[in-house]
Amino acid sequence: MPTLIVLIGPTGVGKTELSLRLAENFHTSIVSADSRQLYAELKIGTAAPTPDQLKRVPHYLVGTLHLTDYYSAAQYEQEAMEILHQLFTEHEVVVLTGGSMMYVDAICKGIDDIPTVDAETRQVMLQKYEEEGLEQLCAELRLLDPDYYRIVDLKNPKRVIHALEICYMTGKTYTSFRTQQKKERPFRILKIGLTRDREELYDRINRRVDQMMEEGLLDEVRSVLSYRHLNSLNTVGYKELFKYLDGEWELPFAIEKIKQNSRIYSRKQMTWFKRDEEIRWFHPEQETEILEYLRLQNLTHLPSLDTF
């Protein structure tokens, strides 16, 4: 049966190298589940696969969009499922990897069939947000859809705005479209989670930020400065350096904030992933144990322990 190996874990844990090794040994491809690696302009700050890594293993949904392109989790689900359908005609196993929780869920569970927001409604809501602010939009959401108001992250403007767009466009609550029924997939899903001790993970995150700065992250941020108003750049590593370029923060302070916010994000990721009882957790260096786990799932064409 076609099998999707879903390799997940917090930022900086070491997903990239292990995903490459798995894909190489299964002679297959990698589909990205990273909402920021989609953008061609964002390479260093998103830890996108390097040219050498892209040569080692074919990757999909990396660098396919530009910053001005609108893209939703529902669009990701549709495009990724089309890619997987094609890949499974050629491979028994495909690897999906990334840390964007909603994108992983889009493939493993499916996205509710929520109407696509038309351009006019989107423009109206963005203008309301700019003129009235998030607090006023939250107040409107409380009146129009109190059930969703109670569970949504009220500090996330994208979520609040999208819910209001649906309310205004359809005359129905956003909640009424959220069936949250898991979709059946024509392939088996094996979820492998990577984790490290907190101190070890935080040290890796800190060192990775330093490496990004050495590789030219500041120049990359300068190159997208004119697009800073876009949601795609409301991203750790970019929003902090925007404040440095504005003269609001000193560079060392901005770098420390990137590290701090990356650590906070890693905790949010782990909180999300820990709710999923289907994930089997390993340390990234437990390659032998991971391979043995896959062997027990009756996968054929497994690499030998000696070559992995």
Swiss-Prot record:
Keywords: ATP-binding, Magnesium, Nucleotide-binding, Transferase, tRNA processing. The keyword Disulfide bond does not apply. It holds the Pfam family IPPT. It is an enzyme of class 2 (transferase). Substrate binds at residues 11-16. Its cofactor is Mg(2+). The record marks 100, 122 as: Interaction with substrate tRNA. Residues 34-37 are annotated as: Interaction with substrate tRNA. This is tRNA dimethylallyltransferase 1.
